[in-house]
Swiss-Prot record:
It catalyses: Hydrolyzes single-stranded DNA or mismatched double-stranded DNA and polynucleotides, releasing free uracil. InterPro entries: UDG_fam1 (IPR002043), Ura-DNA_Glyclase_AS (IPR018085), Uracil-DNA_glycosylase-like (IPR005122), Uracil-DNA_glycosylase-like_sf (IPR036895). Keywords: Cytoplasm, DNA damage, DNA repair, Hydrolase. Its EC number is 3.2.2.27. This is Uracil-DNA glycosylase. It comes from Campylobacter lari (strain RM2100 / D67 / ATCC BAA-1060). SMART domains: UDG, UreE_C. SUPFAM superfamilies: Uracil-DNA glycosylase-like (SSF52141). GO terms for biological process: base-excision repair, AP site formation via deaminated base removal.
């Protein structure tokens, strides 16, 4: 079972940037695990057409910020291929509520009534989970597929070939990716995870204003973090 690049539904600039990764043996292993799970009748999130949504909404040439997550939401209708994000009409998860609280504290932006972060992605925020699929109701169930090899390669390649990117690392899992990033070329902002389990240590990090300050110093347009419709 070979990898056919034409069949990988990912935005063209990213496909070109990552084509060597798609052709490596580990990516074939990911594909094999994924297809086997489908053939076993497993329900997998996000839907197949949204697995690479983070890349499809944030073209490479527009990239400014990378916001790392862990794995997709595992409940029905939540996962949409963007870290922390849920579709319109879906209840806002606790971690995202804390993100909205920090936005309000940091930039005085009223809390959004929905959880769709697509607007951020379209402005150049790569909302990247480390693991890109999950079985329904089984958190981290696809951790053994090998997705981390792919997303680690994405981070390393961005670090090596780009400059002036802002990496937002929230929680220990994301902070462990720091070793993949060249701090001489990029900006790394670390904070506790926004989950309530972190006892609200995330609040007060001011990463939204800090990111925009960095972008302005680089001569780039800031992110409009306001998600209110």
């Amino acid at each position: 079972m070979d990898i056919c690049l034409e069949k990988i539904k990912i935005e063209q600039t990213w496909k070109e940037f990552l084509k060597d990764e798609f052709l490596k043996p580990y990516f074939l292993e990911i594909k094999t695990h994924y297809i086997n799970a489908l053939n076993e009748g497993k329900t997998i999130y996000p839907p197949a057409n949204l697995i690479f949504n983070a890349f499809n909404l944030a073209p490479l040439q527009d990239l400014k910020i990378i916001l790392l997550g862990q794995d997709p939401y595992h409940n029905p209708h939540q996962a949409m291929g963007l870290s922390f994000s849920v579709p319109m009409g879906v209840k806002i998860p606790p971690s995202l509520l804390n993100i909205y609280k920090e936005l309000q504290n940091d930039l005085n932006i009223p809390m959004a009534k929905h959880g769709d972060l697509s607007k951020w992605a379209k402005q150049g925020v790569l909302l990247l989970n480390s693991i890109l699929s999950v079985e329904a109701n089984k958190p981290a169930s696809h951790a053994h597929f090998g997705w981390q090899k792919f997303t680690d390669a994405v981070i390393s390649k961005l670090s090596d070939e780009k400059e002036g990117l802002v990496f937002l690392l929230w929680g220990n899992y994301a902070k462990n990716k720091k070793v993949l990033i060249n701090p001489q070329k990029h900006f790394i902002l670390e904070a506790a995870h926004p989950s309530p389990l972190a006892r609200n240590a995330f609040l007060g990090c001011k990463h939204f204003s800090k990111s925009n300050e960095i972008l302005l110093k680089l001569g780039k347009s800031p992110i409009d973090w306001n998600l209110n419709l």
